[in-house]
Design a protein with these regions (language model features):
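Beta-sheet entry/capping signal
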Residues: 15, 34, 78, 166-167, ...
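The substrate-binding groove and active-site-proximal loops of carbohydrate-active enzymes
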Residues: 204-209, 234-247, 274-288, 340-360, ...
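Aromatic-lined carbohydrate-binding/catalytic grooves of carbohydrate-active enzymes
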Residues: 228-392, 438
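A low-complexity, Ser/Thr/Gly/Pro-enriched, surface-exposed linker/loop concept
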Residues: 2-9, 13, 28-70, 114
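Catalytic and substrate-binding clefts that recognize carbohydrates or anionic sugar/phosphate headgroups
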Residues: 18-20, 61-231, 241-242, 247, ...
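Secondary-structure transition/capping motifs at alpha-helix termini
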Residues: 227-230, 258-266, 288-305, 330, ...
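Catalytic core of carbohydrate-active enzymes
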Residues: 415-426, 433-445, 466-476, 481-663
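Acidic, His- and aromatic-enriched active-site or binding-groove loops in soluble protein domains
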Residues: 286-296, 302, 321-342, 395-411, ...
């Protein structure tokens, strides 16, 4: 039987086009050392970039070949596509320099990669062969024990404690960005690497390479944006709890910190300070004079931070107008409610162009004019129940095709509002992230996690994963969020170990919903959402207070060091909290380390994250390292055994660095 070749390759100046029945694929240069591939079953490609920025630089592109085989090279990265045989054509191989890093894998014939969902949308799969010995890092944050993503799967969807940032860094020296906001899945398993969009018009991904992890991360930031300049005050200590029920409650705590001489730079006003969900203003019964409150806080050099929720219900004075103007997330079927919390709530549609100015006008009138410049963007996923994305209707499209965009536009809305008022020091505490949110000053935390040592261990890996996902501003609730018993020995130990981790996090923030104590007084019996247990550093016993006060004071001494590296993150994309392999990428051991990390280039921190633990093994990379407790100097490229009682932590400083003087 005669076999006819299937498909045709067209070579243009800076791209390759492959066409055959039910497939159109374009591979093109995109900035420096980067290739972009788009592929669809439809007859044409869309020019939709989602959150991708235009190329930051001109491409050094070279193309060659014919209708059967062609290659495109852009600096360090190249791709070769083969027209191939019927049903198995269109094979793509990607290279970093001369090393193959990705190779298309067929699991069944090629049309099986596109399964029709609705209209011109499909469930789309992009599958590559697995590489032996490869490590993957990134994919956002999730409370689990997997830092190296090799051998695992990841659902690409947001929920409380999970931000799906669909980007990975490979130990083979390249990055991969899945440019598709549809919920889906990523499998970096031992038999294949597969990216899935549950419902999309086209596949869209970028592959980029560099000499070092820092080079690769910089290209990612060229593609999606750099964090703005980090506000100096934000490098200090943040005080928070669920929740201060009134203006006076909050001011009492702020005054006590100042009275005790404890350095504090921010205090947080949590949810239900408002009149109703979707009204974005203080309840005057409990917050009678926000202007005076803000003046007093700023005189104490404490920044007020206010929680904003994107939820709204028919009781809100803004509901009718927003609903009629389609500024709310709608449902394809059934009632409007997508979240049950003090009644059925829906969410504002932050992807709608009118929503930003409408909500910002309310925020400006009810918060900004009083002196509030920093906002806590909670519920940023958004948290819908059940998670049936195809039933959600956004301005940007059906939820099955666009739901992952929500935290991007939520952050963008407040960033642009603040910029329009001339603000430059912008930081937004946000519960979810997506590629590009970092450029809006989004400080991500890992959500409502448990108050357990297991959650602390996971949080270390979470922070490192976010660093390799291009999110340099990250933090966690010191002590965890849920079920913390401040009277228990377990929690008293936990909060100290977590605070030690907090000192060496991009932001140090004490927060949580502590269990109420037996004799806790109801200060405001009629309040809708009452406070949990106390959560100030003096709330956990006298011995803990001494330790925690010392840690907060250490954080204050570290502020110049922290600000230096946060500035570098804004300029280069390099995070202050970074995996060991980020700087020591030629040391194979460093790719296996998931419970110690570098804090900038000069501090190595090894958290203690198990109950009763007072010692652990630490790997020191090349160079000479000073133990901050004993001041003993160790030579690197070896493991050392360290001890640290509860009042101590394990950290090393690179010999020759002046930062040793703050310890």
């Amino acid at each position: 039987m005669e076999v006819h070749e299937m498909g045709k390759i067209t070579i243009l100046k800076d791209k390759l086009i492959f066409e055959r029945r039910d497939e159109l694929t374009v591979i093109e240069a995109y900035g420096e050392n980067c290739l972009r591939c788009r592929s669809t079953k439809n007859s044409k490609l869309l020019d939709e970039n989602w959150t991708l920025l235009p190329p930051a630089s001109e491409s050094e592109c070279f193309v060659e070949g014919d209708e059967k085989v062609a290659t495109i090279r852009n600096g360090m990265v190249s791709a070769t596509i083969e027209a191939g045989q019927p049903w198995y054509g269109g094979i793509i191989s990607y290279y970093r320099k001369d090393r193959q890093i990705l190779h298309t894998k067929f699991e069944g014939e090629y049309t099986g990669r596109n399964v029709h969902t609705e209209g011109d949308h499909y469930q789309i799969k992009v599958i590559f062969d697995a590489n032996e010995g490869e490590h993957f890092y990134g994919l956002g944050q999730e409370q689990e024990n997997q830092f190296d993503r090799k051998g695992s799967t990841c659902n690409l969807q947001h929920y409380n404690t999970k931000s799906a940032v669909p980007v990975v860094y490979s130990s083979f020296g390249y990055g991969f960005l899945w440019n598709n906001p549809a919920p889906g899945r990523c499998e970096t398993t031992n038999n294949h690497t597969m990216w899935v969009a549950d419902s999309a018009y086209q596949a869209d991904y970028l592959i980029y390479a560099g000499e070092t992890p820092a080079d690769v991360l910089k290209i990612y930031c060229d593609l999606t944006g750099y964090a703005p300049k980090f506000p100096e005050w934000a490098a200090g200590f943040w005080q928070s709890k669920l929740r201060y029920e009134s203006q006076e409650d909050l001011l009492e705590v702020a005054r006590e910190y100042k009275k005790r001489g404890i350095p504090i730079t921010a205090i947080v006003i949590d949810y239900f300070h408002w009149t109703e969900q979707g009204e974005w203003k203080f309840d005057p019964e409990y917050w009678p004079d926000p202007a005076a409150m803000c003046r007093e806080l700023k005189e104490m050099k404490i920044e007020p931070v206010v929680s904003i929720w994107p939820t709204i219900n028919p009781k809100s004075e803004n509901y009718e107008e927003m609903n009629e103007a389609n500024m709310l997330v709608r449902t394809e079927n059934g009632q409007y409610g997508t979240f049950e919390f003090y009644g059925q709530q829906t969410f504002i549609d932050v992807t709608h162009p009118k929503t930003g100015s409408f909500v910002w006008d309310k925020v400006k009138e009810n918060y900004y004019k009083y002196g509030i410049r920093t906002f806590w963007l909670d519920e940023a996923e958004p948290e819908v129940h059940p998670q049936q994305y195809s039933n959600l209707k956004f301005y940007a499209g059906n939820g099955a095709q666009s739901a992952m965009l929500y935290p991007y536009y939520y952050s963008k809305m407040f960033y642009e509002g603040l910029k329009s008022e001339g603000e430059t020091d912008i930081i937004l505490l946000t519960r979810a992230a997506y590629p590009g949110t970092q450029k809006f000053g989004s400080l991500v935390w890992n959500g409502d996690i448990m108050s357990t040592f297991e959650a602390l261990r996971m949080s270390v890996k979470t922070g490192l994963s976010m660093a390799m996902s291009g999110i340099p501003w990250w933090n966690s609730d010191i002590g965890g969020f849920l079920e913390g018993d401040i009277e228990s020995d377990y929690f008293k130990e936990l909060v100290v170990r977590w605070a030690q981790f907090g000192v060496f996090s991009p932001v140090m923030r004490l927060h949580g919903s502590r269990l109420r104590t037996k004799n806790q007084k109801d200060r405001h019996p009629d309040v809708k959402e009452r406070s949990g247990g106390d959560n100030e550093i003096w709330s956990f016993g006298e011995e803990n207070y001494k330790i925690l006060k010392g840690l907060v004071e250490l954080r204050e001494r570290l502020r110049p060091y922290i600000c230096h590296y946060m500035d570098l993150a804004s300029e280069t994309g390099a995070p202050i909290m970074r995996p060991m392999f980020f700087d020591y990428y030629e040391d194979e051991v460093c790719y296996t380390l998931e419970d110690q990390y570098m804090f900038g280039e000069d501090i190595l921190f090894a958290p203690i994250s198990a109950q009763g633990q007072t010692g652990r093994e630490v790997y020191l990379p090349e160079g000479s390292w000073i133990d901050v407790n004993t001041k003993e100097v160790y030579e690197g490229k070896k493991w050392v055994t360290c001890t640290a009682q509860l009042h101590q932590f394990i950290a090393f400083v690179r010999e020759g660095s002046n930062v040793i003087n703050v310890f």
